[in-house]
Amino acid sequence: MAAYRLVLVRHGESAWNLENRFCGWYDADLSPAGQQEARRGGEALRDAGYEFDICFTSVQKRAIRTLWNVLDAIDQMWLPVVRTWRLNERHYGALTGLNKAETAAKHGEAQVKIWRRSFDIPPPPMQSDHPFFSTISKDRRYADLTEDQLPTCESLKDTIARALPFWNEEIVPQIKEGKRVLIAAHGNSLRGIVKHLEGMSEEAIMELNLPTGIPIVYELDKNLKPIKPMQFLGDEETVRKAMEAVAAQGKVKK
């Protein structure tokens, strides 16, 4: 029998997801479809009778607004919410703002997959002449970060390295106290948590596609190990289509 239950939600489609652009630390908002995805995710949790005690999210509005939509749908908007840059999306460096299909056409699908999905190879860093450099690096929400903490690009390994300490130091104690935890975050920061929970290899995590807006449920034992595979709250067809859409993002448009 499960000792704890954890729910993860990847943010709904953002305006830049819709345009197929590398987003990373750029603060794109949800698209109208993304708002609906988040709302449907919340309704799935409501219909299943889920209640929570504390929520965690990033400092990026697409994750925060996803959480708002979920909390609204389950009528638990009063819950405490902890926001942290450590749950931000991976920083895509110089690729930020570029169309993924155009980048694949220019550099080849294999190179784009390496940048997007390799475990420890970061994309080229964002230089000071990048159109979004100041927008991101000078944003006051990051004013307290040290120079070492503020990235100019990240691999998945880098993303996990800054997300996991927060998981271990802030989220795990809440779960072990019996708090029912909801995390609304991003594809790569959530993949870091999933990799840690399931003990997945670097190769396996590269191939994992988390769908947007669909609640992911983990039943955990007292050592926070999953007692069964992750479950998705949603009908099978919705889940399958969502995961296929995520996998197709870095391919050349036919």
From Swiss-Prot:
The modification N-acetylalanine is found at A2. Substrate binds at residues 10-17, 23-24, 62, 89-92, 100, 116-117, 187-188. InterPro entries: His_Pase_superF_clade-1 (IPR013078), His_PPase_superfam (IPR029033), PG/BPGM_mutase_AS (IPR001345), Phosphogly_mut1 (IPR005952). Its EC number is 5.4.2.11, 5.4.2.4. Homodimer. The record marks H186 as: Transition state stabilizer. It comes from Gallus gallus (Chicken). The gene is PGAM1. It holds the Pfam family His_Phos_1. This is Phosphoglycerate mutase 1. One of its GO terms (biological process) is glycolytic process. Keywords: Acetylation, Glycolysis, Hydrolase, Isomerase, Phosphoprotein.
